[in-house]
């Protein structure tokens, strides 16, 4: 069975299964090895910046910020406008609509359409009574 090699820790894991790799990458020894690995490149970058600037200390980004990254509530191309939560719109809903979005689907009440050739079954009797009470037309004579 092939073994998994961790380049940060410079060691082989006993098994090549996702659970073993996950538990290794969560571990304290691996986290420290990754931190040391990237600190090495940070020191090299600092030295190269010192040489390019002629001895001046380069500007470091504020604590917690990485160059080129936006804060988590910012969208590229917007000016200090926080992102909206999912499912919400940046404008208010039309009058009569709730704030949460579209209302649930509601069925329209059934009504009798006098122009429809056949009324619903529960209204057939009332339609027959309506027709019997109406005055006779010229075609009936």
Swiss-Prot record:
Pro residues biased stretches: 83-97
Domain of life: Eukaryota
Pfam families the UniProt entry points to: zf-U1
One biological process term in Gene Ontology: spliceosomal snRNP assembly
Keyword presence, Cell inner membrane: no
Matrin-type zinc finger span: 4-36
Low complexity bias (residue ranges): 100-110, 124-141
Compartment list: Nucleus
Entry GO CC: commitment complex; U1 snRNP; U2-type prespliceosome
MF annotations from Gene Ontology: mRNA binding; pre-mRNA 5'-splice site binding; U1 snRNA binding; zinc ion binding
Principal place of residence: nucleus
Keyword terms: Metal-binding, Nucleus, Ribonucleoprotein, RNA-binding, Zinc, Zinc-finger
Region: Disordered, residue numbers: 69-141
Role: Component of the spliceosomal U1 snRNP, which is essential for recognition of the pre-mRNA 5' splice-site and the subsequent assembly of the spliceosome. SNRPC/U1-C is directly involved in initial 5' splice-site recognition for both constitutive and regulated alternative splicing. The interaction with the 5' splice-site seems to precede base-pairing between the pre-mRNA and the U1 snRNA. Stimulates commitment or early (E) complex formation by stabilizing the base pairing of the 5' end of the U1 snRNA and the 5' splice-site region.
Family: Belongs to the U1 small nuclear ribonucleoprotein C family.
Subunit structure: Component of the U1 snRNP. The U1 snRNP is composed of the U1 snRNA and the 7 core Sm proteins SNRPB, SNRPD1, SNRPD2, SNRPD3, SNRPE, SNRPF and SNRPG that assemble in a heptameric protein ring on the Sm site of the small nuclear RNA to form the core snRNP, and at least 3 U1 snRNP-specific proteins SNRNP70/U1-70K, SNRPA/U1-A and SNRPC/U1-C. SNRPC/U1-C interacts with U1 snRNA and the 5' splice-site region of the pre-mRNA.
HAMAP family: U1_C
PANTHER family assigned: U1 SMALL NUCLEAR RIBONUCLEOPROTEIN C
Protein name: U1 small nuclear ribonucleoprotein C
Organism: Heterostelium pallidum (strain ATCC 26659 / Pp 5 / PN500)
Lineage, opening ranks: Eukaryota, Amoebozoa, Evosea, Eumycetozoa, Dictyostelia
């Amino acid at each position: 069975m092939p073994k998994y090699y961790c380049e940060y820790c410079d060691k082989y894991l006993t098994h090549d299964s996702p659970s073993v790799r996950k538990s290794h990458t969560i571990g304290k020894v691996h986290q420290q090895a990754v931190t040391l690995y990237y600190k090495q490149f940070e020191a090299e970058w600092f030295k190269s910046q010192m040489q390019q600037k002629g001895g001046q200390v380069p500007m470091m980004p504020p604590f917690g910020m990485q160059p080129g990254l936006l804060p988590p509530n910012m969208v590229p191309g917007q000016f200090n406008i926080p992102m909206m939560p999912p499912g919400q719109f940046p404008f208010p809903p039309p009058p009569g609509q709730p704030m949460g979005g579209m209302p649930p689907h509601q069925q329209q009440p059934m009504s009798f359409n006098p122009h429809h050739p056949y009324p619903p079954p529960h209204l057939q009797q009332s339609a027959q009574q309506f027709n019997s009470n109406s005055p006779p037309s010229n075609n009936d004579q």
